[in-house]
Amino acid sequence: MNYFILILPILPYLYGPAVCSEDETRLVKTLFTGYNKVVRPVSHFKDPVVVTVGLQLIQLISVDEVNQIVTSNVRLKQQWKDVHLQWNPDDYGGIRKIRIPSTDLWKPDLVLYNNADGDFAIVHETKVLLEHTGMITWTPPAIFKSYCEIVVLHFPFDLQNCSMKLGTWTYDGNLVIINPDSDRPDLSNFMESGEWVMKDYRSWKHWVYYACCPDTPYLDITYHFLLLRLPLYFIVNVIIPCMLFSFLTGLVFYLPTDSGEKMTLSISVLLSLTVFLLVIVELIPSTSSAVPLIGKYMLFTMIFVIASIIITVIVINTHHRSPSTHIMPAWVRKIFIDTIPNMMFFSTMKRPSQERQEKRLFPADFDISDISGKPMPASVTYHSPITKNPDVRSAIEGVKYIADTMKSDEESNNAAEEWKFVAMVLDHILLCVFMAVCIIGTLGVFAGRLIELSML
């Protein structure tokens, strides 16, 4: 008797689960005896099955710009009422809910219409939650690979409008009615992506009529997602390096031509840019539908560098010109020696036209007395007796020859200095022009799109 008193409190724990399991076994056996999972769960054939659909987006796995495929991890919640699966909880030990395999009952054949790669229907058959009222809730997980028309025109500052179109495959709107549980998909458990941010999301229900059966509607629910790309990765790894290459290209014109390193720097920048483009080409969507912004900027940078090389060749050629090969036109002297230097910051520098007057070999008042060191009588001329001396005459002619030769060399040097001065003026002009083009070109490519995004 004492042992019975001790065991009595734990009897419910020993026999309770067995009783509950027996009730649930009896309930399942009763429900599925004669149950046909092929037949729609309605009392009359003309009655439609109302299915409430809810999409819960868990993760945006990837966006394939080339193949235009968006891979996402979702949970597709479906609720409907099965009139053949109802019971009185009091008859089965108070059981109000049971979980049964989804393969054992009728389910709406929802599929992803815009499936791009993978299974159209849900593959993972999880259990459903069945209530005593006949209400069924099924929330299977799925990996959807949906088609999305990717517009790469503004890449990497692009905004994509992708969608998932869900509907029954064999039932029309008279047999199965699908309704969204909300005007927005559920993002309560959404895991943020490192590349995309969800700007907006909506769900829409559509009635579609086909030519074969104009009186029969076919229903679908389309979920739209507005995805904004996070461009930081491309700004740091692509755009900023291209800007630095453009800046180095402008510095070519700051380098003195006499250093002989202008072409070396230009070619080095071009080779570096080429190698850089080969490395990052895989980061850019390889599609011919449109040229993306980043592609336009890379093309601009390449043209910018090549143009600097061509112009550098012209500047170096100008720097090394001589009067024996090129005679400076009057308009070149007027523009690049007399006019532009007065308008720019190096206008105080001495120009060849000024230095020519200061570097005369002989002053204007030079006479023969400078040779002998003694004053020559005013009456002495080239035909006077003192100049008839062969030695004196020979000395005078030698001095005149030397003076003429040095004067010719001086004029030649002055002409060469003028060409060098013109090349220096060109360098200063091109330095300002290329730096301005670098800034304006960068703003011209990206500013418009950035302003549009800031207004969203």
Curated annotation (Swiss-Prot):
InterPro entries in the record: Neur_chan_lig-bd, Neur_chan_lig-bd_sf, Neur_channel, Neuro-gated_channel_TM_sf, Neuro_actylchol_rec, Neurotrans-gated_channel_TM, Neurotransmitter_ion_chnl_CS, Nicotinic_acetylcholine_rcpt
UniProt KW Membrane keyword: yes
Disulfide bridge map: C148-C162, C212-C213
Q: Name one Pfam family in it.
A: Neur_chan_LBD
| Residues of the signal peptide | 1-20
Per the record, its GO cellular-component terms are:
acetylcholine-gated channel complex; neuron projection; plasma membrane; postsynaptic membrane; synapse
Organism domain of life: Eukaryota
Q: Which reaction does it catalyse?
A: K(+)(in) = K(+)(out); Na(+)(in) = Na(+)(out)
- Membrane-spanning residues where? 231-255, 263-281, 297-316, 429-447
Annotated localization: Postsynaptic cell membrane; Cell membrane
Q: Which residues are glycosylated?
A: N161
The membrane topology of this protein is:
Multi-pass membrane protein
Q: Which UniProt keywords apply?
A: Cell membrane, Disulfide bond, Glycoprotein, Ion channel, Ion transport, Ligand-gated ion channel, Membrane, Postsynaptic cell membrane, Receptor, Signal, Synapse, Transmembrane, Transmembrane helix, Transport
Which ranges does the record list as Cytoplasmic topological domains? 317-428
GO terms, biological process: acetylcholine receptor signaling pathway; chondrocyte intercalation involved in growth plate cartilage morphogenesis; membrane depolarization; membrane repolarization; monoatomic ion transmembrane transport; motor neuron axon guidance; neuromuscular synaptic transmission; receptor clustering
Q: How does it assemble?
A: One of the alpha chains that assemble within the acetylcholine receptor, a pentamer of two alpha chains, a beta, a delta, and a gamma or epsilon chains.
> What this chain does, per the record?
Upon acetylcholine binding, the AChR responds by an extensive change in conformation that affects all subunits and leads to opening of an ion-conducting channel across the plasma membrane.
PANTHER family referenced in this protein's UniProt entry, alphabetically: NEUROTRANSMITTER GATED ION CHANNEL
* NCBIfam families assigned to the protein according to its UniProt record, in alphabetical order: LIC
According to its UniProt record, which protein family does this protein belong to?
Belongs to the ligand-gated ion channel (TC 1.A.9) family. Acetylcholine receptor (TC 1.A.9.1) subfamily. Alpha-1/CHRNA1 sub-subfamily.
Protein name stated in the entry: Acetylcholine receptor subunit alpha
Q: What is the lineage of its organism?
A: Eukaryota, Metazoa, Chordata, Craniata, Vertebrata
Q: Which gene encodes it?
A: chrna1
